[in-house]
Amino acid sequence: GCRFCMAACPYNAKYFNWRLYQKEAPGQNPDVSVRPKGVVEKCTFCHHRLQKARERALAEKREMSPGEYVPACGEACPARAIIFGDLSDPASEVSRLAKSPRAFRLQEELGTKPKVIYLTEGEGRG
């Protein structure tokens, strides 16, 4: 890859794979693609987990329930420093936190409509 997308990313959120990760690894998750050396990528918020949750809900003929899909980072963080949810649901925790006076988005002035929201230090959650 030429890495021009890395230079253009306003968030510096792209990573370049310098190594070859294509070796046989019996422990690899078959649902997660492993990009070859020379490819730029960024976090997908575990899109494969979202797809699985959608497929499960569709097979069961129901809507996805809140919390049914959580990226691995949100699931693994014991401090709950990463909260994930539906911003379009005003009752969701993530939606309430997004409306907090502590909430801010990076590079919002560039018109990129960021969906990752950060909270400044302060009292409790939202």
Give the ranges of each region predicted by the language model.
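Non-ligating segments of multi-cofactor redox enzymes
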Residues: 1-126
